[in-house]
Amino acid sequence: MINCKLINFDCAQELVSVCRRYDEDIDVICGRYIIDGKSTLGVASLVGNHVSIEINTEDG
């Protein structure tokens, strides 16, 4: 799990761009919300917050 802060929309857009390069499911977690890391609108809704990034692989 990786922790970071989404400072602005450009950071959110860059995170989505990186997530889309991978086939695995990537979740962006903020409190009780779990957002698909490949969703621009979803990740953009978390701008200004500290988030955790979790990569879900078949290995667990």
Regions found by a protein language model. Name each.
Residues 1-6:
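Short amphipathic
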Residues 9-12, 60:
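Alpha-helix N-cap/helix-start and coil->helix boundary motif
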Residues 11-20, 24, 33-49:
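Amphipathic alpha-helical interaction surfaces in cytosolic regulatory modules
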Residues 50-60:
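C-terminal structural segments of small proteins and small subunits
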